[in-house]
UniProtKB/Swiss-Prot annotation:
It catalyses: D-tryptophan + O2 = N-formyl-D-kynurenine; L-tryptophan + O2 = N-formyl-L-kynurenine. Heme binds at H309. Indoleamine 2,3-dioxygenase; part of the gene cluster that mediates the biosynthesis of the benzazepine alkaloid nanangelenin A which contains an unprecedented 3,4-dihydro-1-benzazepine-2,5-dione-N-prenyl-N-acetoxy-anthranilamide scaffold. The first step of nanangelenin biosynthesis is catalyzed by the indoleamine 2,3-dioxygenase nanC which produces N-formyl-kynurenine through the catabolism of tryptophan. The two-module NRPS nanA then utilizes anthranilate (Ant) and L-kynurenine (L-Kyn) to assemble the dipeptide product nanangelenin B. Binds 1 heme group per subunit. It comes from the Eukaryota. Its EC number is 1.13.11.52. GO terms for cellular component: cytoplasm. This is Indoleamine 2,3-dioxygenase nanC. Belongs to the indoleamine 2,3-dioxygenase family. Pathway: Secondary metabolite biosynthesis.
Length: 410
């Protein structure tokens, strides 16, 4: 078995300075004029949606091939464009569409196959591959400066609220990603029984988690709950059984040929559960989500991640060793127990912050909407964009994290 220090992050498409984010800005525009139809329509999503002309324009769009996408950055840009066009087509009218036209479905399926990712709008489309800053050095720099200077390369609504919502998640990826090399060093230190290095890592990890909580706390600065709930969130929807708009259908039909043939597909909507970073934190601390549906859901969300990132998570599961090492140290022998507990509590606090966002941006606006219509909120109304029953899932994953804190403090 390879030593953890020999894990080649570059082979897993992971940056030492920005983690799962590319350490250079994604393309803002495809350089080949052949792809102008994709770029032009994506650049005008908001006015076309507002005028209810988007579906008509996309129905007239030519079917473009992907052979001119000769680099990974170009393929990622194409995937982002087509994902935004697909979501706008499906959810941009008063009545959701259940058919995706060939001009979107065919190239989206083909480029997704090359990228080894679902042919649907994922966390990667919304955050990892669609941000922009003026200078690449900002990506690995101060996370708050990165957040303040970031912009989106695509938008459904053209609002600051939408940009800020996605940018906060992207800034979390940038700040959290910097801890990945330290995780590998800590795993190696465990193998060498280097307690000081492990303790130093746990302290740094706790600080990192605190920084991520601070970033979440900034969501309210530029993202209003009413705008998120009514204007942004619909475009994050999936086509799974838990989506009321598609629960009585087979999902969405992807037209693949001029004769109208194709296939039905069901996919979960874009969700932070598709962030490789948070699952990596669970793996690092040995957090066990042992109830069947949670494990199945989190595993399913890995299939929505970029291929190399999910392979990295599988590799980390093989070599992760921090929790048993912490368990092996009694409170009188070192600070290991208290430092490990502090890191676990830091992850628990991060989940608390996320749950508070869900209440503020989804549960409360939905309750107000229901009350305005003289209706009571029901459990089926509390389904997340990823297709889960939000509150039970978030509470249980938070409680799973808290349950890991059973080591005695020194």
């Amino acid at each position: 078995m390879l030593s953890p220090v020999e894990v080649d992050l570059e082979a897993y498409d992971i940056s030492r300075v920005s983690g799962f984010l590319p350490d250079k800005c994604p393309l803002r525009k495809l350089p080949d004029p052949y792809y102008v139809p994709w770029e032009r329509l994506t650049a005008h999503l908001e006015p076309l949606i507002r005028a209810k002309r988007l579906q008509h324009e996309l129905d007239q769009m030519p079917v473009l091939g992907i052979t001119r996408l000769t680099s990974q950055p170009m393929r990622r840009r194409a995937y982002v464009l087509l994902s935004f066009l697909a979501q706008a087509y499906l959810w941009g009218e008063d009545i959701p569409n259940t058919t995706l036209p060939q001009a979107i479905a065919k190239p989206l399926t083909e480029v997704s196959t090359l990228l080894e990712i679902k042919p649907f709008a994922t966390f990667a489309a919304f955050c990892l591959w669609s941000f922009s800053v003026h200078f690449d050095d900002d990506i690995g720099g101060d996370c708050h400066k990165f957040l303040d200077n970031m912009s989106m390369t695509c938008s459904f609504t053209g609002t600051t609220d939408e940009a800020w919502f996605f940018n906060v998640s992207t800034a979390i990826e940038a700040r959290g990603g910097r801890i990945i090399p330290s995780i590998l060093n800590a795993i190696s230190a465990v193998q060498n029984n280097d307690m000081l290095t492990v303790e130093g890592f746990l302290l740094d990890f706790t600080i990192c988690l605190r920084d991520l909580c601070d970033l979440i706390d900034r969501m309210h600065e530029n993202c209003r709950p009413s705008v998120f709930y009514h204007r942004i969130r619909p475009f994050l929807s999936g086509t799974s059984n838990n989506n009321p708009a598609t629960e009585n259908s087979k999902g969405v039909f992807y037209v693949q040929a001029e004769d109208g043939t194709g296939e039905w597909h069901r996919y979960s909507g874009g969700s932070n559960a598709q962030s490789s970073l948070i699952q990596l934190f669970d793996i690092t601390l040995g957090i066990n989500h042992d109830i069947g549906y949670k494990t199945r859901y989190l595993r399913e969300m890995r299939s929505y991640m970029p291929a190399q990132h999910r392979r990295f998570l599988a590799r980390m599961e093989e070599i992760s060793n921090l929790r048993p090492y912490a368990l092996s140290h009694g409170p009188g022998s070192s600070n290991m127990c208290s430092l490990y507990n502090s890191a676990v509590l830091g992850l628990k606090n991060l989940r608390d912050k996320h749950m508070a966002l869900v209440f503020r941006y989804i549960i409360i606006p939905r309750a107000k909407e229901k009350a305005g219509n003289g209706l009571a909120i029901r459990q089926k109304d509390l389904v997340g964009t990823g297709g889960t029953d939000m509150i039970p899932f978030l509470r249980e994953t938070r409680d799973d994290t808290m349950n890991a804190v059973h080591l005695p403090y020194s």
